[in-house]
UniProtKB/Swiss-Prot annotation:
Disulfide bonds: none annotated. Part of the 30S ribosomal subunit. Forms a loose heterodimer with protein S19. Forms two bridges to the 50S subunit in the 70S ribosome. This is Small ribosomal subunit protein uS13. One of its GO terms (cellular component) is small ribosomal subunit. The lineage of its organism: Bacteria, Pseudomonadati, Bacteroidota, Bacteroidia, Bacteroidales.
Length: 126
């Protein structure tokens, strides 16, 4: 039986600490804290969890962590706020350039997208 936490099916054959990282917003350190609070061994595989353990983990995540859709929407709202107030970071987001001060002369391809080839100027004939 697949264990479903906040809309994500956890992989059955992985350790609990790793499996919880499949939820957006939970990393290794957060998953270790969650399992400690729930009293579940972090080396125990997900398929060996009892229903009570899974319910306790669900309860902890629901009460203390912002994950999945809520977290994604909060991040989007933060970026939208930056764009609306017109600050430097917001402008960089709006025009699709790196936000954190990286150089754009040669690199920044991830942010800028594929190269857009520009035609050369034709030489003037004498």
């Amino acid at each position: 039986m697949a264990i479903r936490i906040v809309g994500v099916d956890l992989p059955q054959n992985k350790r609990g600490e790793i499996a919880l990282t499949y939820v957006y917003g939970i990393g290794r350190s957060s998953s270790a804290k969650i399992l400690d609070k729930a009293g579940v061994d972090k080396d125990l595989k997900v398929k060996d969890w009892t229903d009570d353990q899974a319910a306790k983990i669900r309860e902890i995540i629901g009460a203390e962590y912002k994950v999945e859709g809520d977290l994604r929407s909060e991040i989007q709202l933060n970026i939208k706020r930056l764009m609306d107030i017109g600050c430097y970071r917001g402008v960089r987001h709006r025009i699709g350039l790196p936000v954190r001060g990286q150089s754009t002369k040669n690199n920044a391809r991830t942010r800028k997208g594929r190269k857009k080839t520009v035609a050369n100027k034709k030489k003037a004939t004498k």
